[in-house]
Amino acid sequence: MKINKWLSLTSVSAVMAVLVFCSNKQLNGNEPLLIRLTDVMSTEHYSPYKLNDQFSEMVFNNVLKNLDDDKHFFTQGDIDKLSVFKKSIDDQLKVGRYDFLDSAWSILMVRLNTIEPMIEKELSKPLNYKSNNNYVVTEKVLKYKPNIAALEQDWKNWLQYQTIDRLYRKIEDQENVKQKKDSAVIKILPFDTLEFKARNETLKFCKDWFKRWRKMDQKDKLSLYANCITEVYDPHSNYFPPEDKANFDISMTGKLEGIGATLSEKDGYVKVERIVPGSASARQGELKAGDLILKVAQGAADAVDIVDMKLDDAIQLIRGKKGTEVRLTVKKPDGTIHVIPIVREVVVIEESYARSAIVNFKGKRFGLIQLPSFYADFAAQGRGRHSSEDIRIELEKLKMEKVDGIVMDLRNNGGGSLADAIDMSGLFIEEGPIVQVKDPSQRIQQAPDPDSEIQYAGPLVILTNTYSASASEILAAALQDYQRAVIVGTNTTFGKGTVQTMMPLPSGKSPIFPKGYGEVKVTIQKFYRINGGTTQLYGVVPDVILPDIYDGIEQGEKEMDYHMPYDKIPAAEYKLFKNKNRADIVKSAIVRTQKNEYYKLISKRATELAKMRNSYTYCLNLDGYKSQQKQIKEQDKYFRDYKYKRVIDTAFALPIDLDEVKNDELKKAQKLDWIKRYMKDAGLDESIQILYDWSERI
């Protein structure tokens, strides 16, 4: 099966990547990025806005939300001052100006400089742990504080809440140590010491937070502003400066050129969190998890100090072309300093690719396929990996193992390539349409299975959850409409029913963007099920719904600002898969889950969490806070103490996969570790029972 020509949901398409050049506009020293960006969005988006006062007000509100969603920094007076821009942002964008952003940013920096000393003073001495005040955490719309005094009081309450929570957990941890009689190993600290540590942790959290704001340069600020503009068209249209585009490509291909280390920022240092097995760093052997990177040199060139550098900027220095050398000056946990030379290579992130295992249950063997995303390497021009081809390979391997059914796990799979979703769906049916697509002109096209073969015709379950989105929803919806698979999962999938493509912004550069303007991911189409419905907003409702502890909390597309509406189109013509026992199999599964004690507990806990999430008042008195936490613990004790009993017998890696890595212990461990996580997985257990019922009725 070859990859067809249909667009990807979130990747570059050679067919549709349109270059939209500006006319001979005079930029007058303003930022050309904004002109180019709004030109592309206005001409290429599925549902473009006119640059008018209404559009201006949406951008105004979105910028404020991105800068201060929790109303921690701006007062109502600040908003009143900024409101002079509410209906003029559209006029500014037409000439590349960003006066509103600069004004909002200036006020934000003033507020940081006002609030930080107040925080330092407030946390310089023990807090009042006998306070009668409360701190209200709510999901309802927050209001801006009327003045600085009210803002500071809100901060003091927030600081008290944060510190009491940290202090409570330290006291609890210490009590647990006492009960386990480990006090001889771990020194028991007095209350004053614990309180001091809690205050310092709160202070450090705030300082790190403010530091991240202050590290943002003009490019960062304009990139944020550009995304505030694209987001009002819809939440999946985004701007990518050149550096972010590189990260996006990694997420789509599962590959990058670099040293093979996962990095984080800690106290101004770049810290090594993990070494990727089989990578350049792993083979070189000196760089270890826990090392702090102090300097970076390109080959024999002078080293650049990266302490206190933004993590993204440091990563750009460390990454580089395959075959080039980078020299890292690192500080080891024992304090010694080492210079480590590493020759960069292509790093393959194996856990981002499809993988399979065998599950034994009641004397039968079933296949498990995990697919983290619908990845596709379009830039490799036919030589790169595609998720649909990898799934075809996994299916062939499982067929060689003579499995009695297959479950494909799409939980937390946020989507990816539309082309691969179409081709992958076609692996399970002989022929027919997979998805319908509507463009801005309202023209509807059907995307068919590209061949008449069926790679796997046996029992099939698709496992989903709320974070199965986009391409995942296309595959699940198509196989549900054909009645080819039984869909099992939480009450619905994410609800993203739109198609995006990456469009390069017109060539050029500016002092702020010396490497060029990057690209914009633009929504250009909506997709629809073959039954005429759409997954937009409401997702795919499983045939067998499994209770989830977050059922009472709204999630997914419908909770996102500026989402596109739900609608329908006429159904396509298609023939149902022949499975006369499907309805009975689904009915049996529903009855089984309704009787399941574990799912009854989950439903009960979901109701409790929903009440807490909507609004909760925390006591700012330490004794009162302890009582509240005790009550919360007692509420879910029944859930925490429940001993889940797995249903499946065993799960293990395919012999052919283990044979490939028999001489590499790290890669062998990788092949085995991911399977262990499924050994107490209620979703997998129910899926396997459905497959068993299905296989018994063939």
Model-based region annotation:
Residues 4-30:
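Bacterial Sec-dependent signal peptides at the C-terminal "C-region" and cleavage site
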Residues 22-25, 42-52, 211-220, 234-258, ...:
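Cleft-lining beta-strand/loop regions that shape enzyme active-site pockets
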Residues 24-130:
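Charged, amphipathic alpha-helical regulatory modules used
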Residues 34-46, 84-88, 204-208, 372-375, ...:
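Acidic/histidine-rich, surface-exposed loop or edge segments in extracytoplasmic proteins
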Residues 66, 87, 106, 110-117, ...:
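PDZ/PDZ-like domain segments forming the peptide/carboxylate-binding groove
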Residues 120-258, 262, 267:
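Extended, domain-scale alpha-helical bundle/helix-rich regions
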Residues 122, 145, 153, 168-184, ...:
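Conserved functional hotspot residues or short segments at active or partner-binding sites
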Residues 471, 483, 490-555:
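Polar, glycine-rich mid-to-C-terminal structural blocks
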